[in-house]
Amino acid sequence: MLDVKVKIDLVKPIGRVGFGVPLILEENANTAKSYTECSNLSEVITAGFAATTKTYKVASTIFMQDNAPEKIAVCATTDPTATWLGDVSNTGKDWRQLLVVTNDSDTAISVSAIMAKVETLDNKLYFADLEANDSTSLTVSGINRTILFYCNSSEDYPSPAA
């Protein structure tokens, strides 16, 4: 039996511990854009999301954090998110947290459909936001994989990114 040696270095901080790769998914887009993992904002632009887009703004907010993830993923689908989540080739990728950028005015209905789909996935989480004054009734009983934010949003993108 071998002894285990542990070296503790108080000068060097531990690395960043992450919770997986956040995915910024634009639903109901005019043009689909393939799943791309990005380490910085220039890679988000290369993936097809201009600096004026909601997707870019969410990515910028994520990368501005003190303990930002090493990488994020971006993607756009012409379908609703719940439909996109039904394809195992999309859910089998390395992302873990889902942030949806939408052009749909029926946000609460979309949130309900996405919640229902994500709850069937073992290793995914959904971060959703609704306006603080939203009167939509959402069933939250038995929900384990969805985090809802109710807030007064003055921005064009999901508050959970911040």
Model-derived segments and spans:
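Surface-exposed assembly/interface segments
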Residues: 1-162
